[in-house]
Amino acid sequence: MLKYFGTDGVRGVANAGLTPEMAFKLGRDGGYVLTKDKKDGERAKVLVSRDTRISGQMLEYALISGLLSVGIEVLEVGVITTPGLSYLVRAQGADAGVQISASHNPVEDNGIKFFGSDGLKLSDAKEEEIEKLIDAPEDKLPRPSAEGLGTVTNYHEGASKYLQFIENTLPEELGGIKVVVDGANGAASALISRLFADMGVDFTTIATHPNGLNINDHVGATHTKKLQEEVVKQGAQLGLAFDGDADRCIAVDENGNEVDGDHIMYVIGSYLADHGRLKKDTIVTTVMSNLGFTKALERRGLKNVRTQVGDRYVSEEMRANGYNLGGEQSGHVIISDYHNTGDGMLTGLHLLYVMKDTGKSLSELLSDFKEYPQRLINVPVKDKKDWKEHKRITEAIKKVEEELSDEGRIFVRPSGTQSLLRVMTEAPTQELADKYCEEVAKVVEEEMGSK
C-alpha cells in the first residue's frame, strides 16, 4: 500500500497533513517523474488548476515552485473542474496536469492529484516512483539555474475551451425541461451558468457563490437535501448536484428523490443500448454498485462488469476491454465516447438529453430499477491494512455470504483516505441489510477498533 497516495491522489488537512512543504516536494518530485523522458532541449509543459478552497492558492504556489525548480513550464489554469483539467491536458498536448482539490471533502481538507499526458490518473507504479523520491534521504534531482528554470503562464481561457468541448458532445439545445443545479460552491460554480445558458436549458442555481470556506457545506453531491427541496418547491423536472471539483453528478427526480450514479448509468446505458451505441452491451461499475442495478440490466439483456473501488479502476477496465460507459454509485460516470474521466457537468447534460429525447420523466425512466436495501457502516480502526488476517472477521463475512446467497451480498474494504473499514450489505429487506451489516461491523470493532 502506498504511503502518501490514496485512491484519489494525496489528501490531508491543508497546512497540517498536507503542507506547502509537501506540495513543493510533490511538484518537484512528481514533475520530474512525469517529464524526465523529454528529449534534451525540449521543455516539459504542465497544467495546474484548483477548486475554490481557501487553501488552494497556498498549495498551488508551493506546488508550482516545485515544478519550476526542475525546469518545467507551467500553465496556470486557475479554478476549473477536475475533468476540465483532464480535458485541457490532452487538448494542449501537455506532459501532465495537477489538480489541487479534495473533491467532496470538507473545506479543511485539500488534495493534489496528478494526470499523465493522456489526461488519466497515474498508475500505482508511477505514484510509487514519486513516493520513493519524496522519501529519499537526499534530493539528487536536477537544479537548473537561469535559463534552465521554468516559468508560469496564465491560461485562464482554458475554461472556455473546456465548455465548448462539452457543448459539442450534444446534438441540440436542451430547452423545455426545468432544472435546478447545485454547484456545491465549488469549481463548477463559475461555469454552470455559462454552460447551461449556452445549451438553452431552463435552469436556476443554488450554491454557486464560493467564498473559499463554503465548498460542500451542506450542499453538493454528498448533501442533496437542499436541492431536493428546491426541485419540489420550484416544480422542476430535474435536479443536478456536483461535488467540489465536479467530477461527479448526483440527480434528483421530479418528486424530489435522490438519483445516484447507479441509476444515472442505468438511464444513460439503456438509452445507448436502445440506439445500438452501448459497446458490448456492458456497463462497468465497482463492487459498491447496488445488486438491483445488475438485476435491472439483466432484465434488459445487458451486462455489468465490476472492478475494485475507484473510478481509476473503472477507467482502466473500460480502456482494456473496449467498453464506453462506466462509473461509480457515488456519481462518477465515464462516457468514454466523449471523455476519459468522470465529468459531472457532461453527465448531467447527457441525462437531461435522454429525458428530452425520450419525452419521459426521470422517475419513468427508472421504473424498472428496483434497488436492494443497503446499509453502510464506517468502522474507525487502528490499522486498516491487515484486516483479512483477522479470522473472526473473515468467518463473519463468510457466514453472511452463505445466508444471503445470490439474494444479497456483503462487502468489506478499507477507506482509501481515512483509517476506516467500510462494511456494506445488501439484502431483500432493510431489516436484513441492517442486521448483517451491524453483525459484521461489531466483529470488526471488537477485533480492530480504534476506540
Swiss-Prot record:
GO MF terms held by the record: magnesium ion binding; phosphoglucosamine mutase activity; phosphomannomutase activity
Binding note for cofactor: Binds 1 Mg(2+) ion per subunit.
GO cellular component: cytosol
Binding site for Mg(2+): S103, D243, D245, D247
Presence of the UniProt keyword Ribonucleoprotein in the record: no
Name of the top EC class for this enzyme: isomerase
Entry's EC annotation: 5.4.2.10
PROSITE patterns hit by this protein: PGM_PMM (PS00710)
Matches recorded under CDD domains: GlmM
Keywords, ordered alphabetically: Isomerase, Magnesium, Metal-binding, Phosphoprotein
Active site: S103
Record-level GO BP terms: carbohydrate metabolic process; peptidoglycan biosynthetic process; UDP-N-acetylglucosamine biosynthetic process
PANTHER family: PHOSPHOGLUCOMUTASE (ALPHA-D-GLUCOSE-1,6-BISPHOSPHATE-DEPENDENT), PHOSPHOHEXOSE MUTASE
Name this protein carries in UniProt: Phosphoglucosamine mutase
Classification lineage: Bacteria, Bacillati, Bacillota, Bacilli, Lactobacillales
Name of the gene encoding the protein in the UniProt record: glmM
